[in-house]
Amino acid sequence: MIKDIFSIYNWDVVILYECTCDDIDYIIKALKEIKCPNKFIKEALDNLETCNLNIGLTYSNIALKSSIIIINKTSSFAQLINTISHEYYHLICHISRIFKIKDEEELAYLNGNLNMRSYKIVESLKREVDS
């Protein structure tokens, strides 16, 4: 598992890449730390315990301005990009809702900043998936 922890828009973000079944305890603990409701934790656990590839989850605690994004191992680099894009969209929606960001250009910059932030990690994962 690769961890990336940062703040953007005064919002704390933890992204866990390349998660497997071995990481479930850590993931559940991280979700509990940001006061994730038990209902979502159960749903996350049900998904993660399948040990399937290509699973992504995002949980945001709006009050804490904090999010956790989980990206399981993927079957291909294309699927990795798809999963990351999908989960980033959830994060962008959560941030934009709280900060009332409606300007498309500002949202596009937020998306770009997230992608630039993750570029080196994604690039290293591309080499791993391609080999």
Task: Please state what every model-predicted region is.
Residues 1-49:
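Non-catalytic terminal regions of proteins
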Residues 31-78:
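Active-site scaffold of zinc-dependent metalloenzymes
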Residues 62-64, 85, 127-131:
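Disordered, low-complexity tails and leader-like regions
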Residues 71-74, 94, 112:
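Short His-Asn-centered micro-motif
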Residues 78-79, 83, 102-106:
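Short, conserved micro-motifs enriched in small and acidic residues
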Residues 82-94:
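Active-site recognition of the HExxH zinc-binding catalytic motif
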Residues 91, 95-99, 122:
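Amphipathic alpha-helical interaction segments
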Residues 101-131:
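Post-HExxH zinc-binding segment in Zn-dependent metallohydrolases
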